[in-house]
């Protein structure tokens, strides 16, 4: 089932008929992505799993797409996807490619012409997450809650078991730099590496 997200009525219906996986699509403004970083935190763990099959941040009224704010909002949203990997099984940015002289919609991850390609800020967010995936989601909290926009900060953490690396993704959507202190608890010493 493809949707723009499941409301309560649809969630109950999908669970009742035994749907295993729903395909949710989000083409929304940056504010929506920031506001929905905690979207799956309270999701029914026994309900259908989620394929975030198409998502991209854009601001069509202003014509701004593939800018830094859009990429930042996607990075914030992706902390929630990663934190809830038990529910969100798959995710993909869309659309991926567009020719600068013949495109159907905007935004796109990579633009190209007959001689070259241009990677967008959104591309680099996807690359950062793709190159820093983990095997186990770690519980990361600020003041006892997931980091989903408090003080304009968003975060997720994973462990890459084969390498022993703890990988932290931290998004600062605020207008000023923030001093952040990370404390680890519950990890065995061999699981912590510097780098």
Describe the residue ranges of each PLM region.
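Single conserved hydrophobic/aromatic residue that forms the stacking wall/gate
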Residues: 1-10
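Carbohydrate-binding surface patches
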Residues: 151-189
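Glycoside hydrolase catalytic-domain groove-lining segments
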Residues: 11-64
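Aromatic/acidic polysaccharide-binding cleft in carbohydrate-active enzymes
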Residues: 47-155, 162-164
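Composition- and surface-driven signal marking solvent-exposed, interaction-prone regions
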Residues: 36-37, 64-71, 105-112, 170-171, ...
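A short, local hydrophobic-aromatic micro-motif
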Residues: 20, 53, 89, 191-194
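Glycine-rich beta-alpha junction loops
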Residues: 28, 95-98, 174
């Amino acid at each position: 089932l493809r949707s723009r997200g499941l409301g309560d009525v649809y969630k109950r219906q999908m669970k009742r008929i035994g749907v295993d996986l729903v395909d949710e699509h989000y083409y929304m403004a940056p504010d929506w992505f920031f506001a929905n970083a905690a979207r799956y935190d309270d999701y029914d763990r026994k309900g259908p799993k989620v394929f975030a099959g198409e998502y991209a941040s854009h601001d069509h009224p202003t014509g701004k797409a593939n800018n830094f704010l859009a990429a930042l909002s996607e990075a914030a949203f992706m902390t929630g996807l990663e934190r809830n990997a038990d529910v969100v099984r798959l995710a993909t940015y869309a659309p991926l490619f567009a020719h600068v002289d013949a495109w159907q919609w905007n935004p796109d991850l990579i633009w190209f012409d007959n001689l070259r390609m241009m990677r967008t800020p959104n591309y680099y967010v996807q690359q950062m997450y793709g190159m820093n995936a983990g095997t186990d989601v770690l519980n990361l909290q600020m003041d006892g809650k997931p980091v989903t926009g408090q003080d304009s900060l968003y975060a997720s953490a994973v462990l890459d078991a084969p390498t022993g690396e703890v990988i932290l993704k931290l998004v600062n959507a605020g207008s000023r730099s923030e001093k952040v202190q990370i404390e680890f608890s519950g990890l065995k010493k061999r699981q912590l590496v510097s780098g």
